[in-house]
């Protein structure tokens, strides 16, 4: 007979997570044995874990050919948030945790004065913290958490979740997620002498001084770091948005407004960074495009609860917020066609999403109806690449006959100065 013993413990997976006999015997004349291991529900939200089957040493006349087998154990005690994922967006369910008076110095300003006032807030050396790069994974596990399963993060371009524990730890990116720099790392202009600190030291440890000229801080700034599939991160590389990179085949563009607002934040937070029209080369550094595309994406993919939660989480770590998530309309006052207009937050907070305009049926075939409108509105339909294919004036309960090919479209409904964008599927 051959007596075998094994262990299953691996990291946080331990004896409280299973029951069963770990000492087994293969009888003389047999070559198999079975032992039943029961996975236990300990009632704790620990996230997914890996159980590792490891055999202890065997007699010298035996050779172990297969050992240290890892098996994924999914935690059923995950938490579900009240808001949706980026592909099922919700609006107004996640609170905007903006400190009182945080944006008060922006009021009544325009042009360069407004731009400087924003920078004075988000690059304030007296309050803004710089965490090290090793902490970024921990920040993203919280900030990019899948609202539908707290054991997962949401991958930005891939538009799907992945277990938090599947982050990249070595050179392999297959089946792993890692940290995407929205404003490409090679475009930041960080000195070659800079060596990021990859050892996490927690939320209570940060670099004491920073400012708008502190370009090294841009490497670790989680306002533009996102969880992403390792392979798609490599595919994006340092390509400009819109004119070159538009995501993997078949994506519905749920991330496009997110990257636009992250780029706009970076172009204000760091003096040496700019967002420009076209497809700029990666050298000289400090330029990324395409501005026209990103302005359109900011409108077509409005800030949702997922982004607002990100903003809240990152503020807890860095003590600064992305103002273009809190006030997406601010983008046009800084980068768009309202640079000569005076900013007034009270006139920009009317959230059209709260009026809950509804398009039905969705998916649709050749006809849709609009409800939830309280005044005459303009309705525009765009392809997922941003080309406008239809335009209508609509009232509440309007019915529209469409003649569109099958696919995914963005429907922008505008009333006065506020707007909302909905995704529409044509079968």
Where are these regions (language model features)?
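Low-complexity, Pro/Thr/Ser/Gly/Ala-rich linker/spacer regions in secreted
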Residues: 60-61, 70-94, 336-355
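C-terminal outer-membrane/trafficking sorting elements
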Residues: 350-427
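Short boundary segments that mark the start of a structured unit
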Residues: 1-79
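Domain-level detector of nuclease and nuclease-like folds
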Residues: 171-345
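Long, His/Glu/Asp-enriched segments that create or flank divalent metal/ion-associated functional microenvironments
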Residues: 156-168, 336, 343-344
């Amino acid at each position: 007979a051959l007596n075998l013993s094994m262990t299953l413990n691996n990291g946080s997976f331990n004896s409280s997570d299973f029951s069963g006999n770990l000492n087994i015997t293969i009888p003389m004349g047999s070559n198999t044995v079975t032992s039943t291991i029961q996975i236990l529900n300990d009632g704790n939200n620990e996230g997914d874990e890996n159980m590792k089957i490891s055999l202890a040493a065997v007699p010298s006349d035996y050779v172990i050919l297969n050992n240290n087998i890892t098996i994924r154990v999914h935690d059923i005690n995950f938490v579900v948030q009240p808001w949706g994922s980026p592909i099922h967006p919700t609006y107004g369910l996640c609170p905007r945790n903006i400190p009182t008076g945080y944006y008060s110095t922006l009021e009544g300003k325009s042009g360069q004065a407004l731009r400087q006032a924003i920078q004075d807030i988000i690059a304030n050396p007296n309050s803004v913290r710089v965490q090290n790069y090793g902490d970024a994974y921990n920040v993203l596990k919280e900030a990019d958490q899948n609202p539908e399963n707290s054991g997962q993060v949401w991958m930005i371009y891939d538009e799907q979740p992945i277990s938090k524990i599947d982050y990249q730890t070595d050179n392999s990116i297959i089946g792993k997620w890692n940290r995407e720099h929205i404003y490409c790392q090679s475009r930041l202009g960080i000195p070659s002498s800079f060596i990021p600190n990859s050892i996490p030291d927690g939320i209570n440890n940060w670099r004491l001084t920073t400012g708008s000229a502190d370009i090294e801080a841009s490497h670790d700034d989680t306002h533009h770091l996102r969880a992403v599939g390792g392979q798609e991160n490599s595919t994006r590389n340092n390509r400009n948005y819109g004119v070159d990179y538009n995501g993997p085949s078949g994506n519905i563009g749920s991330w496009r407004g997110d990257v636009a607002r992250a780029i706009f934040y970076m172009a204000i937070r760091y003096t040496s960074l700019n967002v420009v029209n076209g497809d700029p080369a990666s050298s000289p550094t400090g330029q990324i495009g395409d501005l026209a595309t990103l302005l359109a994406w900011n409108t077509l993919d409005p800030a949702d609860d997922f982004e607002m939660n990100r903003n809240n989480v990152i503020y807890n770590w860095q003590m600064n917020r992305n103002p273009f998530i809190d006030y997406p309309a601010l983008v046009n006052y800084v980068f768009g066609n309202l640079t000569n207009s005076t900013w007034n937050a009270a006139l920009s907070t009317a959230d059209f999403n709260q009026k809950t305009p509804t398009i039905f049926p969705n998916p649709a075939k050749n006809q849709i109806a609009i409800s939830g409108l309280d005044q005459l509105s303009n309705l525009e339909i765009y392809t997922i690449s941003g080309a406008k294919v239809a335009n209508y004036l609509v009232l509440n309960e309007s019915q529209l006959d469409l003649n569109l090919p099958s696919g995914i479209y963005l429907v922008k409904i505008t009333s006065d100065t506020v707007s909302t964008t909905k995704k529409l599927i044509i079968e």
